[in-house]
Amino acid sequence: MRNISFMLMADTYKNTNPDALPDGLTKLTSYITPRKSMFKNLNEVVFFGLQAFIKEYMIELANDTFFKRPKEEVIAEYKKYLDNQIGSQSYDIGRIEKLWELQYLPVEIKALPEGSVVN
């Protein structure tokens, strides 16, 4: 059993981000960009670890601490967390209920091959 909840893997305020998006949005693209090197004359990074992250957190942790638990239990825990963090009128719990009902994360990930050198 992991000592972390999938529900706590994102900043709390991100639960309100969908309210800022236009109605009818069907696609959203995000990027992860490496920060500037802290070492002189070192301008490249190796891209690695995404496959392990997806497996451990986006599949196993999501299943163990969210999708495989009873819906009522998950929603009650999530509401308690969000109510304490951002207030009960600041979010739509229906989004979380729909995600639980879907039983998987509806994301498409496109990435460089593991081990790619990026500059």
Give the ranges of each region predicted by the language model.
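Ordered alpha/beta subdomains of enzyme catalytic regions
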Residues: M1-N119
